[in-house]
Amino acid sequence: MTPGEVRRLYFIIRTFLSYGLDELIPKMRITLPLRLWRYSLFWMPNRHKDKPLGERLRLALQELGPVWIKFGQMLSTRRDLFPPHIADQLALLQDKVAPFDGKLAKQQIEAAMGGLPVEAWFDDFEIKPLASASIAQVHTARLKSNGKEVVIKVIRPDILPVIKADLKLIYRLARWVPRLLPDGRRLRPTEVVREYEKTLIDELNLLRESANAIQLRRNFEDSPMLYIPEVYPDYCSEGMMVMERIYGIPVSDVATLEKNGTNMKLLAERGVQVFFTQVFRDSFFHADMHPGNIFVSYEHPENPKYIGIDCGIVGSLNKEDKRYLAENFIAFFNRDYRKVAELHVDSGWVPPDTNVEEFEFAIRTVCEPIFEKPLAEISFGHVLLNLFNTARRFNMEVQPQLVLLQKTLLYVEGVGRQLYPQLDLWKTAKPFLESWIKDQVGIPALVRAFKEKAPFWVEKMPELPELVYDSLRQGKYLQHSVDKIARELQSNHVRQGQSRYFLGIGATLVLSGTFLLVSRPEWGLMPGWLMAGGLIAWFVGWRKTR
């Protein structure tokens, strides 16, 4: 370790000890060397004994700075890892830091724009930042080309070395967790840190955020539910992003929304509809929808529209994940726990050798008490949390896309019920989910699949003669192999002629299945059935030789 890393590690340890976070380590795990090490740091007592553990952890992370604050925010969404009293405290972490010098931001903008002065591209550039966070800060201006109001987001200077240095130390501490905590291995601390690192590094690339915002804007073009500000890609780079300035009411400012005459019930329901549309229609969802990133338009309060900003973190689901997730929700609310268990196995989220009966019983035990509440009071996010926590006992692998989804759903649900406490999430979401599943099966789905594949088939038409020729040639080779096997079988001293028939059929079916498996994977299960039938025939023939 470098001297700088040693100093930083010392500061981290001193901070943890001054907040009494060594209490997190169970006494049976405190070995003699650890105990001696703690006694040697006697001048670092717990100075916050009057505060609960969760609050002390939050305050310690706050003191350690931006990288640790964002790490705590990410951990607050992993309620499968922490008890509620800790997760709730981590959720209170605020990513607010002092702004850096506006003149320095101006220099960065000029460097990104080819060295020309800011005045060459923008009018009314405001040197004082509009907002500031740990990764970037925002300045206002007008585009010189058309006079439109914009905000310019600039990455903090020299932030990358700081992030890398702290991440290195977080990785070191993560490797100690399995040794110090009895449940440390299940927490998979290194994987959690790796997930955080990816999210953090992605946020440092504003070209990625620009592309995300453009995609979301395209998906909701002309939508009455959600507006994404326009991005000006010609002005964007890795360290700078320029987008339309918006004016709206923060979604957390319920008093102003009510004063503006907003239809709160419709607004809450639209939040749910926006989320499920992003997930199931678009397979591309804004995964950082906390209240600070959501506004409501002042216009048409009777027909309210959300405004979304800060698209640095997005999630996506593949077709299989979407289908299994939708069917899981519906099966759960129909209390069909057997179906829920089978879906987890079919999706590959839990190992294929999982005992479905035991898994069903575990899900029933955890989830059935939820239905003691009215449906309107059941939390979708906590349903997912209960399912995933139960599944982890059956060795469910961490699914990053589902973790993002769960986090976003908790945000959406929290905002919706803050706006309209009587919001019935299930009543709002069920028609959407049932309609989506219905659309994925039957004739409409078949026609859509044909339309999707038709261009590929047309493109491959000129190659068809060559493909047919290759198939015939491989077929000849297959026939030659079958004949050779048949001759070898005939040369054996088989006591019953019938056995030769079964052995030949078995060989033919196995070889045919193998050939189709390699050359025609689109035939689905057919090659497998042929090979299975061949093995059965072969086994019957072998038995008849005995």
Swiss-Prot record:
Subcellular location per the Swiss-Prot or TrEMBL entry: Cell inner membrane
Active site: D288 (proton acceptor)
Signal peptide limits: none
Annotated InterPro entries: ABC1_dom (IPR004147), Kinase-like_dom_sf (IPR011009), UbiB (IPR010232), UbiB_bact (IPR045308), UbiB_kinase (IPR050154)
Stretches that traverse the bilayer: 501-521, 522-542
Residues the entry annotates as binding ATP: L130, A131, S132, A133, S134, I135, A136, Q137, V138, K153
Protein name: Probable protein kinase UbiB
Domain Protein kinase: from-to ranges: 124-502
Lineage, broadest ranks: Bacteria, Pseudomonadati, Pseudomonadota, Gammaproteobacteria, Enterobacterales
Protein EC: 2.7.-.-
BP GO annotations: regulation of ubiquinone biosynthetic process; ubiquinone biosynthetic process
Membrane topology according to the record: Multi-pass membrane protein
Protein family membership: Belongs to the ABC1 family. UbiB subfamily.
GO molecular-function terms, A-Z: ATP binding; protein kinase activity
Keywords of this entry: ATP-binding, Cell inner membrane, Cell membrane, Kinase, Membrane, Nucleotide-binding, Transferase, Transmembrane, Transmembrane helix, Ubiquinone biosynthesis
Gene Ontology CC: plasma membrane
Functional pathway: Cofactor biosynthesis; ubiquinone biosynthesis [regulation]
Role of this protein: Is probably a protein kinase regulator of UbiI activity which is involved in aerobic coenzyme Q (ubiquinone) biosynthesis.
Chief location: membrane
Pfam family, one: ABC1
